[in-house]
Amino acid sequence: MEVRPKEGWNHADFVYCEDTEFAPGKPTVNADEEVGGPQICRVCGDKATGYHFNVMTCEGCKGFFRRAMKRNARLRCPFRKGACEITRKTRRQCQACRLRKCLESGMKKEMIMSDAAVEERRALIKRKKRERIGTQPPGVQGLTEEQRMMIRELMDAQMKTFDTTFSHFKNFRLPGVLSSGCEMPESLQAPSREEAAKWNQVRKDLWSVKVSVQLRGEDGSVWNYKPPADNGGKEIFSLLPHMADMSTYMFKGIINFAKVISYFRDLPIEDQISLLKGATFELCQLRFNTVFNAETGTWECGRLSYCLEDPAGGFQQLLLEPMLKFHYMLKKLQLHEEEYVLMQAISLFSPDRPGVVQHRVVDQLQEQYAITLKSYIECNRPQPAHRFLFLKIMAMLTELRSINAQHTQRLLRIQDIHPFATPLMQELFGITGS
């Protein structure tokens, strides 16, 4: 490098991001491990990171010395004839004096590795890193211990509170026959204009989808229920008692799931109630999705099966119903159990539920679970096809939130003309009276 006149000398010609360019490998001795605590760079006084080329220095001076020696540059001091003070702030101002200070401190050119040795060392470090990662169980690379603990707790809660075989779902009401148990409410047989309007809306809510039910007995017998043809409206109410029993059974499992989670138990009881009232239906649908067979349009709940009846408009007509579209779209993502339970946690810890007091605490918990879900996906689904999976899941949760609001309004309209909700349903959905 040529020495320029004082007035035109540009130090940037020699220095290239000296404070961010690290030599490969680690120093043999960490500066913080020295007796007496953190050490300072013998060249410029900055915080040292260890011994580099025989001297305790910072990363900046280490990189500077290595580059200067490799370039074999001829430098002259443009200021004070070789007497510049080298500090953290002035080390870039005079390269000649900085190099002199490096040599006077004891830095040795012969300790600089050749380019070939550097590449060999880098390859060795990468190989050891790959070997170290390969010894870890699948699914834990990149996850912190706290995140692994959170997933374990959620999986444990799910296992303890979700009866995937529905073997404990007993003593439920089956759909009634047309002659008993499903007559049109008396108030609607000669309705007023207001009652007729309510009835038409309920009819629209319920008639968009028909569901058949199959029950397999322990003795091998099979009981089938198929929704009857339109018979003046009374057939609409036949499934309500059974669905109320199934919903109540699922809601109890959701409540117990939340109680297993330590972060949930730490919240005030008022916030626990508010979160459960807001999220129980959403968590219930996430669990139902795990037993949904998208190929047959059937929820396989142990001995019970619920199958969608093809409407006149065919399969595409079903997808116009937001709830059904949600189940098909979510099932298409082919989620892991861990991803399902993390979705449940994100839904449960929603800080904007009505009545929540500790918004910040709940918001932080939701963020932790969301970050854990993102990390889990990055660790377990590195394929390009899954690079948008986290965003898709969060979009599904947003859609589920909207469906929850619609469902609550539907339920209240039905309850208003034909009370069917169980006490637990009334508590969760804020239904007063019967």
Swiss-Prot record:
UniProt keyword list: Activator, DNA-binding, Metal-binding, Nucleus, Receptor, Transcription, Transcription regulation, Zinc, Zinc-finger
DNA-binding region(s), chain positions: 38-107
InterPro entries found in the cross-reference section: NHR-like_dom_sf (IPR035500), Nucl_hrmn_rcpt_lig-bd (IPR000536), Nuclear_hormone_rcpt_NR1 (IPR050234), Nuclear_hrmn_rcpt (IPR001723), Znf_hrmn_rcpt (IPR001628), Znf_NHR/GATA (IPR013088)
Intrachain S-S bonds: none
Ranges annotated as NR C4-type zinc finger: 41-61, 77-102
Domain of life where this protein originates: Eukaryota
Entry's Gene Ontology cellular component terms: chromatin; nucleoplasm; nucleus
Regions annotated as coiled coil: none
Segments forming domain NR LBD: 146-433
MF-aspect GO terms: estrogen response element binding; nuclear receptor activity; zinc ion binding
Family matches, as SMART domains: HOLI, ZnF_C4
Subcellular locations according to the entry: Nucleus
UniProt key word Magnesium: no
Region (Hinge): 108-145
Annotated positions binding hyperforin: 247, 285-288, 407
Gene Ontology terms: biological process: positive regulation of DNA-templated transcription; regulation of transcription by RNA polymerase II; xenobiotic catabolic process; xenobiotic metabolic process; xenobiotic transport
Motif segment (Bipartite nuclear localization signal): 66-92
Lipid metabolism listed as a keyword: no
Chief location bin: nucleus
Pfam families linked: Hormone_recep, zf-C4
Protein function: Nuclear receptor that binds and is activated by a variety of endogenous and xenobiotic compounds. Transcription factor that activates the transcription of multiple genes involved in the metabolism and secretion of potentially harmful xenobiotics, endogenous compounds and drugs. Response to specific ligands is species-specific, due to differences in the ligand-binding domain. Activated by naturally occurring steroids, such as pregnenolone and progesterone. Binds to a response element in the promoters of the CYP3A4 and ABCB1/MDR1 genes.
Subunit structure: Heterodimer with RXRA. Interacts with NCOA1. Interacts (via domain NR LBD) with CRY1 and CRY2 in a ligand-dependent manner.
Family (UniProt): Belongs to the nuclear hormone receptor family. NR1 subfamily.
Descriptive protein name: Nuclear receptor subfamily 1 group I member 2
Gene symbol of the encoding locus: NR1I2
